[in-house]
């Protein structure tokens, strides 16, 4: 059977382990798909660019980043929820700073991977939860987690938000100090496909999603799942166990339309999208 190539982009984090397991055990090939994985450490903003340029067929994006970019013209659609549990963002500062509590961060810069990335959008939501609205000069682009480490070693007064388990080695080694956690009230990841990929490879997209759901379900039942995650992601076993206990991969492809509407409302209040579409109009523009 001839294999259909399918390009998928995602961050190098434990959430995406089911994709890698499916590649390694040949599960995608068994359904006629040659899955080509592209790791994108810069995150959602960079993957939105790949989708716009047609350089990937699918991408695993944080929900608010997916909603914002599609509403701002990205020729792609949400095809499925991927992780239904909310993303737990750690709020970090340099260990040599005098910053110790959320209130200390009001008015300070945020380090972000890039503009319109997950770290950028969530920093704006977090700042709003503290009662202030950042401006462009409140953001420092650091490209990725390692760039954040380098910048925060200077002990400049700034904050950086990234997923808690991923950043746990930095916190445990005393490279970052965590002063808060922030969980937005919506699912953390969506699977987004280009309209061209849906037109040309729609059946393969849905077969691939069926495979990855099966791999996620199998991973959740493995006795050694936490050990595997800790080894593959180079995080501590306690951090892996805590993350595995909380994560909920989507198992039926359903998209929470109410959650998408809440995301769009938050983005509009932050000035990141225009217009006030109804929930029905919003879903029609976002979801296939």
Residue ranges and their predicted role:
Residues 2-132, 139-142, 158-164, 175-183:
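Short, glycine-/small- and polar/acidic-enriched structural segments
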Residues 268-288:
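Conserved C-terminal helix/tail region of periplasmic/extracytoplasmic solute-binding proteins
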Residues 146-229:
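Pocket-lining segment of extracytoplasmic ligand-binding domains
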Residues 200-274:
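Secondary-structure end/capping motifs
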Residues 127-128, 171, 230, 268:
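Residue-level preference for well-ordered alpha-helical positions
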Residues 12, 44, 116, 120, ...:
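Solvent-exposed, acidic/flexible segments
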